[in-house]
Structures are given as C-alpha cells and as structure tokens.
Amino acid sequence: MLTKLLKISCTSRQCTFAKPYQAIPGPRGPFGMGNLYNYLPGIGSYSWLRLHQAGQDKYEKYGAIVRETIVPGQDIVWLYDPKDIALLLNERDCPQRRSHLALAQYRKSRPDVYKTTGLLPTNGPEWWRIRAQVQKELSAPKSVRNFVRQVDGVTKEFIRFLQESRNGGAIDMLPKLTRLNLELTCLLTFGARLQSFTAQEQDPRSRSTRLMDAAETTNSCILPTDQGLQLWRFLETPSFRKLSQAQSYMESVALELVEENVRNGSVGSSLISAYVKNPELDRSDVVGTAADLLLAGIDTTSYASAFLLYHIARNPEVQQKLHEEARRVLPSAKDELSMDALRTDITYTRAVLKESLRLNPIAVGVGRILNQDAIFSGYFVPKGTTVVTQNMVACRLEQHFQDPLRFQPDRWLQHRSALNPYLVLPFGHGMRACIARRLAEQNMHILLLRLLREYELIWSGSDDEMGVKTLLINKPDAPVLIDLRLRRE
C-alpha cells in the first residue's frame, strides 16, 4: 500500500514539493565533467572491479541516495534505502534496464543468427514477448523439480571428480564448480553432456574450457563497455574485440547444440526441446535464448557456490548443522534425493544459502531505467534515469541486520519476519527477476546436501575475509582453497 501511495504521489501535486533532481548529493567530477576519471587505474580511487567498495564509500560520503555523473549526460542514481528499493522494483510496466549494451551491438551485427538482442539487453514489448514464452519451463516450481534426478546424477559424478582431484591437499573449488555448472547448464538447456570432468575436457583447448573462458571474458567486458565514453560504438576497442571473440565462440557452440537437438527430434526434457516445439518462438529466438542461458548459467551459480562453500568451511557449527540435515534427508549417501525432501525437509540448507547470498550476492544490486517520474528519499528523479540499487552495501549495515558481517544463517529462522524483504535480492525482483532463480537455488541445495553428507570442509586459504571482484557478477578475488575430509559413518 505504501509503495502504491508513493507512486501516485509523484503524479500528483505532491511531486512539486520534492527536492529537485539536481540537489541529490554525489560526485560530479571536476567542473561537472563527470566522475569517470575516478575509475581509471592509477588515477582514481574507485575501480570497476571493486564496485562494492565504491558503493560503500559513496554511502559514507553522501548518504542513502547518490547521483553520480559518469560523463556529462550519463548519470546513475544509487539507492541504499530498502523503502526506495521497494518503490523502484515494484513496477507496473515492462521493466527496463541499461545493461549489456556492447553485447546488443554484437548481436545486431549478426542478423543471420539473431532476430533480437536477447533477454539480457532487450527492453519493452519485445523483451516480454520472449520472456513470457521461455519462463514457462524455467520458473514454474513443478517444471524445476522435474530436473532433480538429472542434477543429482551430475552432482554425484562431480563429487567423484573432486575425490580424484584431492591428491592429499586442498582444492581450489572455483574452477571445479565452474565445470559443474557448465555441465549442468548444457544438460538442462540442450540435453547434452560435455563430459567436463574428464581429463580430455580439462585441456585448455577443449570445448568445456573454452566455453568457461568465453563466459568469463564476456562478463568481464560488460561493465567497462556499459559505462563511460563507449568508444566501441564507433571503433573496435580492445574490450569490444574480446567480447565479440568470446561471443562468437559461445554462439557457435549454441548453434551446434541447438541443431543437434533438432536433428534428434527434440527428444528428452531439455529446455531447448520445449522451445523448439513452441510455435511462438522461431529459430533465432531459440538460438538467442540458448546463448543467453550459456552466458548466464555458468559463472553466476559458480561464483555464488564458491562463496557458499567458503562460508561453510569457515563456520564449523554451521557445517555440523548442515551435515545433520543432510543425513536426515539422505540416511545413506547412496540414497536417491527425493523432490519432496527438497521441497519440505531442508529448512536449514535454505537458510545457509540465503545468508551466503546476503553477504555475497550475485551482483552489487539491481538496475532499472525509470518508466515514469519517481520520488526517492524525498528527491524527484525523472523518467528515463538509470537507477541502481546498492543491496550488497545495504545488507552489511547495522541498521538492517544485527552483527551484519557475521555469517549467521539462524537469523533467517528466528527473526525472518522482522527483516525487510527488499534487502536480500540476489536474483532481482519482479517481472525482470532472474528467470532461472529456482533452478539455480535447487542446484545449489543439491550440491550442499550431497557434499556435506559425505565430507567435512576445512578452510585452507587466508585468514582474511575473502574479497570480491565485480566482473558484472561478484567473483571471489582469491583461490577458494578447501580440504575435503571424508566423514566416517
């Protein structure tokens, strides 16, 4: 109700009494020429690779709403207050965002492959046309549960792969988790196994390794090409060249796997088999969606899983509770994991994942382009403005969470009703929330149950807190070194 009243207020005479947009505090750069210089290596105090630190600094200097001029004519309004975040994300129209601009340009240059720029960059009715069709197979709880057996089978294979990788010492988990999520993404999307755990596929020239590299390269190029002067619109900059080369390879694999699926008569329960049969989607829609799922499905869940295992390994009491829950769900490690158990019997596992995503979300926040004028923290913000939430910073503030830097899953079991629902939004919110959220969560739940059922996780990395690199999505900035010790029954 409050959100509705706030929205109405901006279209009424009350909007007149809001403080002007120009009065929002924040960095404008020397002579109003923009703050881009402050992100340049060796010159500025900020970094595109440390956006969370820049966000914390701006909050401390300017408060809960910040207007930053990147270059003249290109502003970002940053929001830290959950009331403002709720107002932004409870949209009535098709949500718009300003992201993946260079990816959109690459796809526009390939009209023989793509009819649209895909789910990630596209806005408006065309975005909704695609989203409405592809989300049926990805968002419905029943559809997601249909993948449990496949995911569980690959996860058990992954744990055997970890056993073979131990060699008596700690394992850097992130590269291993990336292979797991690549394998799961290709299996669920295309119904295809890449055999990513084999020695052959661990070769740097293999398809698996090249796909992993291409996904990370693409994601690392998004922020630098989205912001600033965008010279790539006029000439081939190094970042645009890297993105294009990476996307060209991912596109070739997506085309190959889609065609293979079609040749096989679209058999099985893969996502692409359903999309190929959908009369509302043509071949270019299917290929674009396949490329999007490859790009979005590999690194996001891998990085989130790496932070998750890091927190568990550093918190033995949490780990013991997880092990006990895993034993209740899987009395024997050889038992099948049931869909009913995942739905009703893993309360603590869910809390652990949520707490990890509070401290280390997939991204620093959620971006939107305003569809209408709005008021945030008493300031007028006009339609068309780029607004980005700062959930990662907000989730580490004492006014929102008691002892905010402590990893404490029990907070989600004991005081959940008192916690603002617009603070922890790792998958976004509303119509434009992550289309594969339920599937990603289910995959991570299965990984936790299987791994903690058999192994104790011992942290072998630095005693310092794990840092973050913001490659569009948040990545651990150091090896996630964990020693796996087989539990005795």
UniProtKB/Swiss-Prot annotation:
Its main location: mitochondrion. One of its GO terms (biological process) is midgut development. GO terms for molecular function: ecdysteroid 22-hydroxylase activity; heme binding; iron ion binding. It comes from the Eukaryota. Heme binds at residue 434. Its EC number is 1.14.15.44. The keyword Heme applies. Complex coexpression pattern of dib (disembodied) and sad (shade) in the early embryo that restricts to the prothoracic gland cells of the developing ring gland during late embryogenesis. In larvae and adult, coexpression is seen in prothoracic gland and follicle cells of the ovary. In adults, coexpression is seen in the follicle cells. PROSITE patterns: CYTOCHROME_P450. It is an enzyme of class 1 (oxidoreductase). The keyword Magnesium does not apply. Transmembrane segments: none annotated. The gene is dib. GO terms for cellular component: mitochondrial membrane; mitochondrion. This is Cytochrome P450 302a1, mitochondrial. InterPro entries: CYP11_CYP27_families, Cyt_P450, Cyt_P450_CS, Cyt_P450_E_grp-I, Cyt_P450_sf.
